[in-house]
Each structure stands twice: as C-alpha cells, then as structure tokens.
A protein has these predicted regions:
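Twin-arginine (Tat) signal peptide motif
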Residues: 1-23
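Exported/periplasmic ABC-transporter solute-binding proteins
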Residues: 27-83, 89-92, 96-115, 120-265
Length: 265
C-alpha cells in the first residue's frame, strides 16, 4: 500500500510538472509565435530600414529578418525561389523584372522612396570639384580608381554610369573603375582609403563618417532614383502585407527622411 501511494504521488507530480510546463506556451501572444517577415532589401536601405523594422517590432511584437544586397542579386534569388515575403528594390527595373515573371502580388506594389547619387572622397581628402558637363574627374583620381557598384546590373552603378555619360566624362574614367558587388561595398572602398573617390547614394555617404560628399550629380543626368516595394507572390505570411504597408505610414516615413531619403507620395 505504501509503495502504491508513493507511485500515485510520483504520477501526480509528473502531471503537475507537465501542466506547469504548458502554461507559458498558453500565455504566449499569437504575434510572438508567428513567423518573421522575410525581407529582401537593397543594400543602401540598411540603416533606415533597420530602424523602421525595430520600430514595427516594438509596436506589434512581430519580427522581421532582413537580407541586404544589390537589387540585382536579390531579384535573381527571388527568381530562383529563395524564401522571402517582401522585396524592396533600389530601382524600377529589377522590380519590373520580378513582376514580369509574376513573382509579386501586383496590388501590393508601391513606389516608396527617392534618393540622389553623389561623388564622395575620404573625410580628410582635399578633393574639390563642381559637377558639371566636362568636369575634371580623371585628374582628381590621380593614380587611383573610382569606386562604383557594378555598372551593368546594380542600380547605383547604372545611375552613376548614366550620369558620367550625360556629363561627357565617362570615356575619361571608364578604365579606372573599381566595381563592387553593391553600393555599400563601393562606399567601403572609399571609407577604407582603397579608392580616392566613389559614386554612391547620398544616404550612404551620410551613414559613413569616414567619407565626405564632394559633389551631387544633377538629377537630370540619370534616370529618376525610385525604391519600389512589393509583397512576393509566394508569400503566405499574413504579416507581410502589414509590414509593407507600415513602410508608408507617418510613423515610418520620418525614419527614412532622417537618413536622407525622399518620401514619394
């Protein structure tokens, strides 16, 4: 009888422990148990988008996981069925690329932000110039190279090349280009002193204290810089549309403006 009582006591204790272990799960909010929103975003968005995502998580209790890279690389990954919920490109071309392949939800697409491209140098550089037709870019480089994102596929590189062609100076520097995989990598070349000059977004320059802006390229020298956003067609995450919509709210837009982006209405 004594042993039976002990066995019953042990069994009851086990049931109670199991029940206690289940209580925290029952009390976890549904938002905390939902899957993170997987975001593919242009590298130039990192500082601002990190702030916006943190704000959204604080307000909703929901999480994001953001992969930053060149828009071209991200679009190709999306085409290859990489798991993602939201895509933010640094130009219209790569958003069009995935849209033409029916990889986004068309009704979710919106133009979010604008930007400028600038010529940057190291913070202690004495380089100075006025960006105008025929300006002396080659002499400013000396024996160094001009850092740019890939000029054939990455938006910042394409914008930069278009501007240099429009200003009539591309032919003088085309053999002095140091191409990087994305605009932040190009910025890093200048920031580290590995290239005397670079062409990056104005927002990138503002994010790095080791560079300074030498000049701003006139907007009429290159296609308009537009950052579109869309939810991917393959996304089954119910929070994806909510996050994409949050990017255009009065709470989020000032965080983009703080980093130097232009808000598109």
């Amino acid at each position: 009888m004594i042993w039976r009582r002990r066995d019953m006591a042990r069994g009851l204790a086990a049931v109670l422990i199991a029940a206690v272990g289940l209580v925290p799960l029952a009390n976890v909010p549904a938002a905390a148990q939902s899957s993170p929103v997987l975001v593919f975003a242009a590298a130039s968005l990192k500082n601002a988008l990190d702030d916006v995502a943190a704000q959204w998580s604080k307000e909703t209790g929901k999480q994001t996981k953001i992969s930053y890279a060149a828009s071209s690389a991200l679009a190709k990954q999306i085409e290859g069925a990489a798991p993602a919920d939201v895509f933010i490109s640094a130009d219209l071309d790569w958003m069009d690329y995935v849209a033409q392949r029916k990889l986004i939800k068309p009704e979710s697409r919106a133009n979010l932000l604008g930007n400028r491209i600038v010529l940057v140098a190291g913070k202690d550089s004495k380089a100075a110039t006025k960006i105008e037709p025929g300006f002396g870019l080659r002499p400013l480089l000396g024996d160094g190279r001009l850092a740019m994102a890939n000029i054939e596929s990455v938006p910042a590189g394409k914008y930069g090349k278009a501007a240099l062609e429009a200003l009539g100076v591309w032919s003088s520097v085309q053999d002095r280009i140091a191409q990087a995989e994305n605009v932040r990598a190009a910025l890093l070349l200048v920031s580290r002193g590995e290239a005397p000059l670079g062409i990056v977004y104005q927002t990138d320059a503002a994010a790095d204290p080791n560079v300074k802006i030498v000049g701003v390229f006139p907007e009429n020298t290159h296609p308009a810089i537009v950052y579109p956003v869309a939810v991917l067609a393959s996304s089954a995450n119910p929070d994806a549309a909510a996050f994409a919509a949050h990017l255009r709210t009065p709470a989020a837009l000032p965080l983009f403006e703080k980093q130097g982006f232009t808000v598109l209405k």
